[in-house]
Design a protein with these regions (language model features):
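Catalytic cores of the polymerase beta-like nucleotidyltransferase superfamily
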Residues: 1-188
Length: 188
């Protein structure tokens, strides 16, 4: 793996949409990976590999993009949210995969695939995907208040996944916090 080539320990897992789409039998687009090592260490080591470009796309949030001739992959250090402002989070880096999953928006996006092809699904996202059920991770009201963009993502995913079963708690949260959408940028 790339980590072994860079002399890194730790673990990198594909996470989110790529895993979700693969499980759903859809074409996989962007690849995001969660990593349980300090992102600056990873970036520094990967920069030493010929033909690899590392872009600091969001170091404060633990994210870099790794680009080679074939593809680009976004790497983000495992983390938890310690504060939010309705759109952006203050994060704390850690190496607990379950905590990283708990900060994600939907159970179907809290799916991880390791280098051995093993699925890590701490929140039941695979079952939700199979049942075409769209659920927020934890309380829907908390997820929406943390990031208002999640309301739009809920609508998008419910359409993308063939009219996924509506979650009553989610619909109530969307109704209750609809005014937060006014604070989102126009391109969203």
């Amino acid at each position: 793996t790339l980590f072994a080539a860079a002399g890194l320990g730790g673990e990198a897992r594909i996470v989110g949409g790529a895993v979700r789409d693969w499980l759903a039998g859809r074409a996989v687009g962007d690849i995001d990976m969660a990593v349980n090592l300090p992102i600056q260490l990873i970036a520094d080591r990967l920069r030493q590999i010929q033909h690899i470009k590392v872009i600091n796309t969001g170091l404060a949030h633990g994210t870099v993009t790794v680009v080679d001739a074939a593809q680009s992959i976004e790497l983000t250090q495992t983390r938890s949210d310690v504060a939010t402002d309705g759109r952006h989070a203050v994060v704390e880096f850690q190496d607990d995969w379950a905590e990283d999953a708990a900060r994600r928006d939907f159970t179907i996006n809290a799916l991880y695939l390791d280098a051995g092809g093993r699925l890590f699904d701490p929140l039941g996202g695979q079952a939700d995907l199979a049942a075409q059920r769209l659920r927020f991770v934890g309380r829907a009201t908390d997820r929406v208040q943390e990031d208002a963009l999640r309301m739009l993502r809920y609508c998008r995913f419910s359409i993308d996944y063939n009219g996924a079963q509506y979650d009553k708690q989610a619909v109530e949260a969307l109704r209750g916090f609809a005014s937060l959408a006014a604070g989102l940028s126009g391109e969203r």
